[in-house]
Regions:
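P-loop NTP-binding core
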Residues: 2-354
Length: 354
């Protein structure tokens, strides 16, 4: 992402923001401001986005990896936190079984001990990761025990260890697992925003409704939490009917709000297979596709049987670029609106009176 949409403008707090026109769809706003939980720097978490849907296979990990990868390539500092025990993020970014892959041990230790997360730096330039994996199996019974002892306050454990490092980044994405609600509740208690991928089939929409129920419950603990929007993933149709149906489902799940992103990510099975097999992101595949010799040249040189990368990688990468621009535009609009509201609230009563 280059130009105005790919670079961020500094806010008064020193964080960076995108510079493009305002998107017409409004996100679900946070609740009325309340006192933040003691010891948690909510300001540091204002660019923390939880990728949530209780249904698996709807694109959560793909969106996290590709959006963060493109933002990092454009000069943003990004952090990814993987709460998934399957750790598919390690496959998408190509660090499975490498030095960065601790299988969730570091994340587990931080949450148990209450010490700041220690991201693995430089998985891509500007892109750091807190890995997930099999060790997170041990986190579930631990959280069950803590909730029994402390109540829902126990779900602030991730916020407490993420906030000390989140301020070092322009964007933080939390990849949430399907169905393991306790780990997702940790993310909802830490995040400022929810971004929700879904497919247009029944399973994805049911998963979205389940998230809607827990979203409202999470806001009792984290009133800063808002819904940034829903994204149609792996869709073969861009018809208005499909978008209208999904928009209606979002509205039903989130109490009358229907923020559906204009950009959707197209279905491209070969590109998805190439990406996970090679540990490449869509924009990286796009570059490799452009560099590979023409099919007839490979055939002439005796390489006709070698597997070629799918040319649809360029189209998929374009979808992610468009979604990234739309996401940054919406973030900037909401941040400016919040800043203006705070400024008006801070004015003396006599100045605020016309």
């Amino acid at each position: 992402m280059t130009g105005p949409a790919g670079r961020a403008a500094r806010t008064t707090s020193g964080r960076r923001r995108a510079t493009r026109a305002v998107r017409p769809v409004e996100p679900v706003p946070p609740l009325a401001p309340e006192e933040p939980a003691p010891g948690i720097d909510r300001e540091a978490l204002t660019r923390t986005i939880a990728m949530v849907n209780d249904k698996g296979g709807v694109g959560k990990t793909s969106l996290v990896a590709n959006l963060a990868g493109q933002f990092a390539a454009a000069g943003y500092r990004c952090l990814l936190v993987d709460l998934n025990r399957q750790a598919n993020l390690a496959d998408d970014l190509g660090f499975r079984d490498g030095p960065a892959d601790d299988r969730g041990a570091g994340l587990l230790v931080s949450v148990v001990a209450g010490t700041p997360l220690r991201p693995v730096e430089g998985v891509r330039p500007g892109l750091d990761v807190v890995a997930g994996g099999a060790r997170l199996v041990d986190l579930v019974p631990l959280m069950v025990s803590r909730v029994q002892e402390q109540g829902r306050e126990a779900f602030l454990a991730l916020a407490e260890v993420l906030a000390p490092v989140a301020g070092d980044y322009d964007l933080v994405f939390v990849d949430c697992p399907p169905e393991t609600t306790i780990l997702t509740d940790l993310a909802l208690a830490a995040a400022r925003w929810v971004l929700m991928p879904t497919k247009s089939d029944g399973g994805g929409l049911v998963g979205m409704r389940l998230v809607g129920e827990r979203f409202e419950l999470a806001r009792e603990l984290n009133p800063d939490l808002g819904l940034l929007g829903a994204v149609l993933f792996a869709t073969g149709s861009r018809s208005r009917v499909v978008h209208a149906e999904v928009r209606e489902a979002v509205e039903e799940a989130f109490g009358g709000h229907s923020p559906l992103f204009t950009t959707s990510i197209r279905h491209a099975e070969r590109t998805a297979q190439d990406a996970r097999r090679l540990g490449r992101l869509a924009h990286e595949l796009e570059q490799e596709v452009a560099a590979q010799p023409a099919w007839w040249a490979s055939l002439r040189e005796g390489g006709g049987s070698a597997r070629r990368l799918s040319p649809t990688a360029a189209s998929v990468a374009g979808d992610y670029r468009d979604l990234g621009v739309e996401l940054l535009t919406l973030l900037r609009a909401t941040e400016e609106s919040t800043t203006e509201s705070a400024r008006l609230d801070a004015r003396p009563e006599q100045e605020a009176t016309p």
